[in-house]
Amino acid sequence: MAKQSMIARDVKRAKLADKFYAKREELKKIIYDINSSDEDRWAAVLKLQMLPRDSSPSRQRSRCRQTGRPHGVLSKFGLSRIKVREAAMRGEIPGLKKASW
């Protein structure tokens, strides 16, 4: 089980990313627009840098929904590889079965 503080930190980052999503996209649109002036682009870069660091979506970590484990998380299920295997062996994931060839 992951530390509760680490899980809470990721939840906080997700909330911040949702809160600042529109503003970040608006600023990035100005920055990547070829037709905008250099002054506007530079001002947008400075404003983007002033936003909270944790509001960037790349700061989020995918974690297992059951255990909070940060590594080996299968995004299709939202679970770590260990919990996916356990659930598959119990038959809790429809259509998923152990491979054999």
Swiss-Prot record:
Give the top-rank taxon of the lineage listed in the UniProt record for this protein: Bacteria
Pfam families per UniProt: Ribosomal_S14 (PF00253)
Q: Does the keyword Acyltransferase apply?
A: no
Q: Which cellular components does GO assign to this protein?
A: cytoplasm; small ribosomal subunit
Q: Name one GO biological process term.
A: translation
Q: Give UniProt keywords alphabetically.
A: Ribonucleoprotein, Ribosomal protein, RNA-binding, rRNA-binding
An example of a GO molecular function for this protein is: rRNA binding
Q: Ribonucleoprotein: present as a keyword of the record? A: yes
Q: List, alphabetically, the InterPro entries matched.
A: Ribosomal_uS14, Ribosomal_uS14_bac/plastid, Ribosomal_uS14_CS
- HAMAP family referenced in this protein's UniProt entry, alphabetically: Ribosomal_uS14_1 (MF_00537)
> Which PANTHER family does this one have?
30S RIBOSOMAL PROTEIN S14, SMALL RIBOSOMAL SUBUNIT PROTEIN US14M
Q: What is this protein's function?
A: Binds 16S rRNA, required for the assembly of 30S particles and may also be responsible for determining the conformation of the 16S rRNA at the A site.
Q: Which family does it belong to?
A: Belongs to the universal ribosomal protein uS14 family.
Provide the assembly information: Part of the 30S ribosomal subunit. Contacts proteins S3 and S10.
| Protein name (Swiss-Prot/TrEMBL) | Small ribosomal subunit protein uS14
| Organism encoding this protein | Haemophilus ducreyi (strain 35000HP / ATCC 700724)
